[in-house]
């Protein structure tokens, strides 16, 4: 299947173009490619392409859906006929007849499908990772139980529209630049239904539908991420009699976690450690989605080193296995030191670089003369004791 071109590209417009710009451009292109005027090969297909782009972009609701979801947002929500329904083509022929054949001529549009709805669902990091069932309350329109959706008062029924004779369409003919164009527009009296209600239902005032609320449970699968869309078929607004209800689209939003971040199916976390733990090594308990686990920090670990905890990440959608947890080590530098800690660090610096401050050397020499020799711990043990006590 060929990939559809971008509607804005077809009309040569940008996404911030006004409705007037869209209408003006369409009229110009439609006049150029209308098959009654342009007999070149491909002109009719070009005209259809232009008309489809205009039908979507000239309608605020369809345009918003397209801007957000692209062609998928239009194809999933509207039938081919719904795309063109209600658009003002400015007299450039019978668009319905051109797209759908002569069978559309003279017939009512038929019952309209219900509108799709969207609901933003917020879940915690853990709920998205493990899956959760959430109860939601959706405002929507439902079929009126009093009139069964007809809009007519009980005991009565809708009548044929006198304005269009029940066709749902009004045809007009006009001449432009010496050419005669036939236009079919939706009947304004019956809005394309072919019927009118003379005695409206007292419950829905003739609309056939009423506002209501629907409580339901939504299953968010393990591994869901922000932006994921769940489609619940038939849970949108009610359609007209004989037409299906729209769908409900649940947009998942995952709230931020205090410690964890997510990249694909991996969990990212940071682990602050002391510089003695980094230098000497240590076994440290690390928080994961599945509880605390022991992780070994080898001696000589540098700050920003990353350690991988296998299978401690997010469950993969529609697949087996999990991601990993990536733990980035952050070495903390102490800001308040005791004299003992400073002395030990000076000694460490001397052993590392062979240079010791003269004042410290004299002080330590005098101290050693006044003390009796005794067995002492190694330098690293002293440093560890001093900084972890």
UniProtKB/Swiss-Prot annotation:
Binding site for Zn(2+) 1: 144, 147, 201, 204
Region (Disordered): 145-167, 351-389
Organism: Methanosarcina mazei
Spans of repeat CXXCXGXG motif: 144-151, 161-168, 187-194, 201-208
Family: Belongs to the DnaJ family.
GO cellular component, one term: cytoplasm
CDD domains reported for this sequence: DnaJ, DnaJ_C, DnaJ_zf
Gene Ontology molecular function terms on file: ATP binding; heat shock protein binding; unfolded protein binding; zinc ion binding
Name the record gives this protein: Chaperone protein DnaJ
Basic and acidic residues composition-biased segments: 355-389
Domain J residue range list: 6-70
SMART domains hit by this protein: DnaJ (SM00271)
């Amino acid at each position: 299947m060929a990939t559809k071109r971008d509607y804005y590209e077809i009309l040569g417009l940008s996404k911030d173009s006004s409705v007037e710009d869209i209408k003006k451009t369409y009229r110009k292109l439609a006049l150029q490619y209308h098959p009654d005027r342009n007999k070149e090969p491909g002109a009719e297909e070009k005209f259809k392409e232009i008309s489809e782009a205009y039908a979507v972009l000239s309608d605020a609701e369809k345009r918003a859906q397209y801007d957000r979801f692209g062609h998928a947002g239009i194809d999933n929500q509207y039938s081919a006929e719904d795309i063109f329904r209600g658009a003002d083509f400015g007299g450039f022929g019978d668009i319905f007849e051109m797209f759908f054949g002569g069978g559309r001529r003279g017939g009512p549009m038929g019952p309209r499908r219900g509108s799709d709805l969207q609901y933003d669902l917020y879940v915690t990091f853990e709920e998205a990772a493990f899956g959760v069932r959430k109860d939601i309350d959706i405002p929507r329109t439902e079929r009126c139980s009093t009139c069964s959706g007809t809009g007519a008062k009980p005991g009565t029924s809708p009548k044929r529209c006198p304005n269009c004779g029940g066709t749902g369409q009004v045809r007009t003919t006009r001449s432009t630049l010496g050419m005669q164009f036939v236009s079919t527009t939706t009947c304004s009296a019956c809005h394309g239904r072919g019927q009118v209600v003379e005695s409206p239902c007292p419950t829905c005032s003739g609309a056939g539908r009423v506002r209501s609320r629907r409580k339901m449970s939504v299953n968010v699968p393990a591994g869901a991420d922000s932006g994921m869309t769940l489609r619940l078929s038939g849970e949108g607004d009610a359609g007209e009699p004989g037409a299906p209800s729209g769908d409900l689209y649940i947009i998942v939003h995952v709230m931020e976690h205090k410690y964890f971040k997510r990249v694909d199916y991996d969990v990212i976390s940071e682990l602050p450690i002391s510089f003695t733990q980094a230098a000497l090594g240590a076994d440290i308990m690390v928080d994961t989605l599945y509880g605390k686990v022991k992780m070994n920090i080898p001696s000589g670990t540098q700050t920003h080193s990353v350690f991988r905890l296998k299978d401690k990440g997010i469950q993969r959608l529609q697949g087996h296995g999990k991601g990993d947890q990536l733990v980035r080590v952050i070495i903390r530098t102490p800001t308040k030191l005791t004299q003992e800690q400073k002395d030990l660090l000076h000694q460490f610096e001397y052993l590392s670089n062979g240079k010791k401050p003269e004042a410290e050397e004299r002080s330590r020499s005098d101290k050693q003369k006044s003390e009796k020799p005794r067995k002492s711990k190694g330098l690293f043990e002293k440093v560890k004791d001093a900084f972890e006590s």
